[in-house]
Amino acid sequence: MEQLFVDDPAFASSMSSLEADIFSGAGQLPSSPWLDLDLDDDVQDLSMAPTTANAVSSGYGSGGSGSHRKLSHNAYERDRRKQLNELYSSLRALLPDADHTKKLSIPTTVSRVLKYIPELQKQVENLERKKKELTTTSTTNCKPGVLGSQLMSEGMAPIVSATCINDMEIMVQVSLLSNVAGSVLPLSKCIKVLENEGLHFISSSTSSGFGNRTFYSIHLQRSEGTINEECPAFCERLEKVVRNKAKL
């Protein structure tokens, strides 16, 4: 059998060509299809892995962005409440001194302010009415420049008006000639007279009006010893005391 293949010329020719193909590469083995793989692509794919991990990590980082927004919102809300508290504190400071003994709640502050505003409006209306009456009296009964000499010659007391703002507060208005205000009844003396009647001084203001007149506006608070006295009667007594004091 072996002799048959050896003697067969076709078989010998095919074997010779196969051996030639095998050994024609000077000892090199035939190339394998696996050797055509591009290793650079594999390395590039591996280098992309951290980027993918970072992308995943950034996905989890969106939760951090939400936390940042929450912190910003909390800081904004804290500042807003602080500003509101400062505004309410300023509003409480405008209330009478009796309301400053303790820190009022926000609803109580608003309630007190809503009650206090009409009282102030009433006070302004009374002052405007008094001023109008004084101006009308000055222009009707006397000529400019004559009223001062008439008051000084006759020894007339200044015009005094006391008004109850509420159960605890009183506003006293005094009108007198400007050229005698400093000697007859200066503001400091007028305040001292009122304090001697059991009142606590809160604030005051002065202004000059028509007819060479000076106006005092004095805001006072009643003490505990004067609360039992009816406000209209108490105001009337204050007016008399101030007028009598101005005659000294």
Curated annotation (Swiss-Prot):
Q: Name one Pfam family in it.
A: HLH
Q: In the record, what terms sit under GO molecular function?
A: DNA-binding transcription factor activity; DNA-binding transcription factor activity, RNA polymerase II-specific; protein dimerization activity; RNA polymerase II transcription regulatory region sequence-specific DNA binding
Which residues lie within the region annotated Basic motif? 68-81
Stretch list, region Helix-loop-helix motif: 82-120
InterPro entries for the chain: bHLH_dom (IPR011598), HLH_DNA-bd_sf (IPR036638), MASH1/Ascl1a-like (IPR015660)
The UniProt entry, under Gene3D superfamilies, shows: Helix-loop-helix DNA-binding domain
One CC-aspect GO term? RNA polymerase II transcription regulator complex
Which residue ranges does the record assign to the bHLH domain?
68-120
Transcription regulation among keywords = yes
Residue ranges for motif Nuclear localization signal?
A: 68-75
Tell me the compartments it is located in: Nucleus
GO terms of biological process kind? ethylene-activated signaling pathway; positive regulation of DNA-templated transcription; positive regulation of siderophore biosynthetic process; regulation of DNA-templated transcription; regulation of ethylene-activated signaling pathway; response to arsenic-containing substance; response to cadmium ion; response to iron ion starvation
Name the UniProt key words of this record, in alphabetical order. Answer: Activator, DNA-binding, Ethylene signaling pathway, Iron, Nucleus, Stress response, Transcription, Transcription regulation
Primary role: Transcription activator that binds to the DNA motif 5'-CACGTGG-3' in the promoter of iron (Fe) deficiency-inducible genes as well as of genes involved in iron homeostasis, thus contributing to basal tolerance to iron deficiency, iron uptake from soil and iron transport, particularly during seed maturation and germination. Promotes the accumulation of mugineic acid family phytosiderophores (MAs). Required for ethylene-mediated signaling during iron deficiency responses. Improves growth and yield, especially in calcareous soil with low iron availability.
Q: Which family does it belong to?
A: Belongs to the bHLH protein family.
| Protein name stated in the entry | Protein IRON-RELATED TRANSCRIPTION FACTOR 2
Organism encoding this protein: Oryza sativa subsp. indica (Rice)
